[in-house]
Amino acid sequence: MLYIEVLLLAIGLSMDSLAVSVTGGAVLKNNCTAGNIIKIASVLGIFQAGMTVIGYTMGLGFEKYICAFDHWIAFTLLLYLGGKMIYDSTKEEEEDGKFDPLCNRTLCGLGIATSIDALAVGISLAILKSPLLLQASTIGVVTFAISAFGVYFGNRFGKRIDLKLDLIGGLILIGIGTKILIEHLFFS
């Protein structure tokens, strides 16, 4: 696989992370520091690279088992997180339990949900006998960069438009989950 193909693959895999990071940036409002941008982008990048490695090591032998339910895992996680964001958007701003993109548990859930495709890609890369280190590191770095941009962009956009961005973000997460489910059920 040529490096340009690896780069395009990494960009494609990072699109769900971009959507999630834009939402996270919008929800952060005045708490969008460089450290918080790095935290969100790092978690999303590490999960993308890590799931690629896990998929690669699982290889062809387990592909049929993983493909049977990976879309349900992603859908369920994104439905839950999106639903929580929508529910939280109806509450008062001061209430505890508001969707927090900096919460480690939330970040891990988002990391898993947005990197399920990377697991399948890792399996495919094992079949192709592609060099794992190049693939996984490129996927992780590209996802980090795109996610960092997404958090920053989402934060700037969110400050300019006074909308219920957590409501919109929740709908986006549910939309991503639904897209993953439909693609796997009807188009794979």
UniProtKB/Swiss-Prot annotation:
The keyword Transmembrane applies. It is a multi-pass membrane protein. It is found in: Cell inner membrane. Belongs to the MntP (TC 9.B.29) family. Keywords: Cell inner membrane, Cell membrane, Ion transport, Manganese, Membrane, Transmembrane, Transmembrane helix, Transport. GO terms for cellular component: plasma membrane. Pfam families: Mntp. PANTHER family: MANGANESE EFFLUX PUMP MNTP-RELATED. Probably functions as a manganese efflux pump. One of its GO terms (molecular function) is manganese ion transmembrane transporter activity. This is Putative manganese efflux pump MntP. It comes from Parabacteroides distasonis (strain ATCC 8503 / DSM 20701 / CIP 104284 / JCM 5825 / NCTC 11152). The keyword Transmembrane helix applies. Its main location: membrane. The chain crosses the membrane at residues 2-22, 40-60, 66-86, 107-127, 133-153, 167-187.
